[in-house]
Amino acid sequence: MPRKIRVLIVDDSASVRQTMTEILESDPGIEVIGTAPDPYVAARRIQQEVPDVITLDVEMPRMDGITFLRKIMAQRPIPVVVCSSLTETDSETASQAWEAGAVEIILKPRVGTAQFLLESKIHICDVVKAAAGARLRSMPAAGRANRPRVPEKKLTADAVLPPPVAGRNAMARTTESVICIGASTGGTESLREVLEALPAASPAIVIVQHMPEKFTEAFARRLDSLCDMEVKEAVDGDTVMRGRVLIAPGNHHMLLQRSGARYYVSVKDGPLVSRHRPSVDVLFRSAASHAGSNAVGIIMTGMGDDGARGLLEMRKAGAYTIAQDEATSVVFGMPKEAIALGAADKILPLEMLAMEILRAGNR
């Protein structure tokens, strides 16, 4: 019988600690080995028994969660799932959590927290189980000076995508390529590593990164400050063009569209697709319909299977498709599913993706 995943819960709220314990221990594969009201108690608990996963609040007495997260990753890396009542004004804090090494962030409301956690039981257990298998990587410090240079019921994307339009114009070959990237758990820092390595005049890039609403704007701002390419949160109608990276806003789907030789994005509401909004499948399938062989599809680290079928559609439409390899994926879920479907032309490690983007995008 496989060993249970051992979890340490760190939260200053006694009721949250109790509710989280009940939720996690309802899964037969998870065991809560302890709880702590603050990082100091947590540190002593870790010395007694090292957990497989830590769930961590951010706002706590004596030491904030981000400081504790940085100490964990510097001294004894352990997969950490941040579970906190962050609001849109705390979006920079969320960025700091991902930068410090958090595997995932679960948002809990400031009121009705216990009920929310109970309703999110399956998601929370899935995230913790994915975190237990995460490959923690030491990422290079952000900054221009030292970055590498390169010359629920699951709906399909049909619920969001418009019916296909007859005619050959949408599939006609143009001189410009569009790079479509999908990522989830572990993607924030992996994307940073890829985008930092690209020069300003790189091919156009559109990205779906699973992330809560309002946090994508801060994520885009952070990347824009680090990268030579322009990085922005997409708004409806934004032009897709060389030198620009568009990131789908949280809680909205992003579709690639085409008018003549011009590509642009449509940002829209819609149901959850593959349990996500934005959905990688929605972006990839729209790229298959409107870009065809002009597109390059890349599926990166993340749990679940969002994007796998969409990548297969891109490949069938003539796009060049890539899956990140297992060794460099924080969570080898989405790429694994895509590879199993035969959706990937090539499987590459993270450090080779920037070079391949330039090669494929300029072909």
Swiss-Prot record:
A Pfam family per the record: CheB_methylest
Q: List each copy of the CheB-type methylesterase domain by range.
A: 172-363
Gene Ontology annotations for the cellular component aspect, listed alphabetically: cytoplasm
The protein's superkingdom reads: Bacteria
Q: Which residues form the Response regulatory domain?
A: 6-123
Q: Name one GO biological process term.
A: chemotaxis
Q: What does the record give as the active site? A: 184, 210, 306
Task: Tell where it localizes.
Answer: Cytoplasm
Q: Which reaction does it catalyse?
A: [protein]-L-glutamate 5-O-methyl ester + H2O = L-glutamyl-[protein] + methanol + H(+); L-glutaminyl-[protein] + H2O = L-glutamyl-[protein] + NH4(+)
4-aspartylphosphate is found on 57
Q: Which UniProt keywords apply?
A: Chemotaxis, Cytoplasm, Hydrolase, Phosphoprotein
Q: What is its EC number?
A: 3.1.1.61, 3.5.1.44
Give one GO molecular function term: phosphorelay response regulator activity
PTM: Phosphorylated by CheA. Phosphorylation of the N-terminal regulatory domain activates the methylesterase activity.
- Record Gene3D superfamilies: 3.40.50.2300, Methylesterase CheB, C-terminal domain
Q: Assign the protein's first listed, main location to one coarse class.
A: cytoplasm
Kindly give the PANTHER family that the UniProt entry links to this protein. PROTEIN-GLUTAMATE METHYLESTERASE/PROTEIN-GLUTAMINE GLUTAMINASE, PROTEIN-GLUTAMATE METHYLESTERASE_PROTEIN-GLUTAMINE GLUTAMINASE
Q: What does this protein do?
A: Involved in chemotaxis. Part of a chemotaxis signal transduction system that modulates chemotaxis in response to various stimuli. Catalyzes the demethylation of specific methylglutamate residues introduced into the chemoreceptors (methyl-accepting chemotaxis proteins or MCP) by CheR. Also mediates the irreversible deamidation of specific glutamine residues to glutamic acid.
Indicate the family of this protein: Belongs to the CheB family.
Fill in the domain comment: Contains a C-terminal catalytic domain, and an N-terminal region which modulates catalytic activity.
Q: Which NCBIfam families match?
A: PRK00742.1, PRK12555.1
Name of the protein in its database record: Protein-glutamate methylesterase/protein-glutamine glutaminase 2
**Biological source species:** Rhodospirillum rubrum (strain ATCC 11170 / ATH 1.1.1 / DSM 467 / LMG 4362 / NCIMB 8255 / S1)
Native organism taxonomy: Bacteria, Pseudomonadati, Pseudomonadota, Alphaproteobacteria, Rhodospirillales
What gene codes for this chain?
cheB2
